[in-house]
């Protein structure tokens, strides 16, 4: 039987930015956030297989996780059994995780120079980065993922990749 155990839609999402200038330097940052919503961690379904798949390495448990060993144990994972036939890794609410995050989407640091002796009013040199850091408790690669293949659950399934981290160098000239 099935039961509703959360929603993939966040309760609140958005972004904010800041720009600072000091002498000839400028710094700007853009953040994005999401609060609420559950993510189905498909990678855990595949790799936290509790011995079901004999052809794959088994995932090391994270701090605070434990395996069932004897009756009465309260554990986050079933017992690991080589060639496990118990289907311990079928779709389960244990693969649902909080989708909250705060992401540093972009950060740019620039320096402005006046080069009027060469006919240049301003030259700005800058370094920029995108998708630099994500603060989250989600154990997967990236909590900001599309729903896979029109699925009703938001999951980092096969064929989905996290946002690419980029680093750039730039030069702006004003004549």
Region locations from a protein language model:
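Residues that define the transmembrane beta-barrel architecture of outer-membrane proteins
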Residues: 10-14, 100-105, 121, 163-167
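Extracellular loop and loop/strand-boundary signature of outer-membrane beta-barrel proteins
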Residues: 2-4, 92-96, 154-159
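Conserved small-residue
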Residues: 1-8, 48, 58, 65, ...
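Extracytoplasmic gating/loop element in the C-terminal half of outer-membrane beta-barrel translocons
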Residues: 35-124, 129
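Repeated loop/turn-to-beta-strand initiation elements of outer-membrane beta-barrel proteins
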Residues: 24-27, 116-117
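C-terminal beta-signal and terminal closure region of outer-membrane beta-barrel proteins
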Residues: 52, 61-64, 70-72, 89, ...
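Outer-membrane beta-barrel pore domains and translocons
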Residues: 21, 32-34, 128-132, 174
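Membrane-embedded beta-strand positions of outer-membrane beta-barrel proteins
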Residues: 29, 125-127, 171
């Amino acid at each position: 039987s099935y039961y509703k155990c959360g929603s993939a839609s966040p309760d609140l999402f958005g972004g904010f930015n800041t720009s600072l200038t000091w002498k000839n330097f400028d710094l700007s940052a853009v953040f994005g956030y999401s609060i609420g919503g559950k993510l189905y961690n498909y990678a855990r379904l595949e790799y936290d297989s509790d011995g079901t798949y004999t052809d794959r390495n088994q995932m090391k448990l994270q701090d605070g996780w434990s395996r069932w060993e004897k009756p009465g144990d309260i554990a986050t994972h079933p017992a690991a059994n080589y060639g496990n036939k118990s289907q311990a890794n079928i779709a389960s609410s244990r693969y649902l995780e909080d989708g909250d995050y705060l992401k540093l989407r972009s950060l740019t640091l620039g320096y402005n120079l006046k080069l009027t002796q060469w006919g240049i009013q301003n030259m700005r040199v800058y370094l920029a980065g995108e998708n630099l850091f994500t603060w989250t408790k989600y154990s997967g690669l990236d909590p900001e993922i599309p729903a896979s293949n029109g699925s009703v659950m938001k999951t980092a399934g096969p064929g989905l990749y996290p946002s690419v981290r980029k680093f750039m160098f730039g030069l702006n000239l004003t004549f």
